[in-house]
């Protein structure tokens, strides 16, 4: 099975709204640190890894508005899709008191790899959805 860094719901829905959920998942793709950033399961279930409940809320809102929605399929601990590419907090080594050991030795090449694997495909798909209509309103 091929890893997909995002999922889209209701791509053909007609509303001009576009719902985004940057922190929908606490998933570490298998091709990043072998799927394990060295953070225990309890911490991966906390807000440090994703926004708990945001996925369901965004999905319900999109359905209610008859709008498309896009969801990141990777944890913000892998690379944060809600940051600019040059943001120093793009790949956190410490988050809310938890050491992210899988990011500890991540260098510029690993950062670029994660940008290409997760971040850029997500933002490219988001831009394509937004461009469908000239008057799209993005709700994040």
Predicted segments with their positions:
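N-terminal catalytic or cofactor-binding beta/alpha core of small enzyme domains
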Residues: 1-138
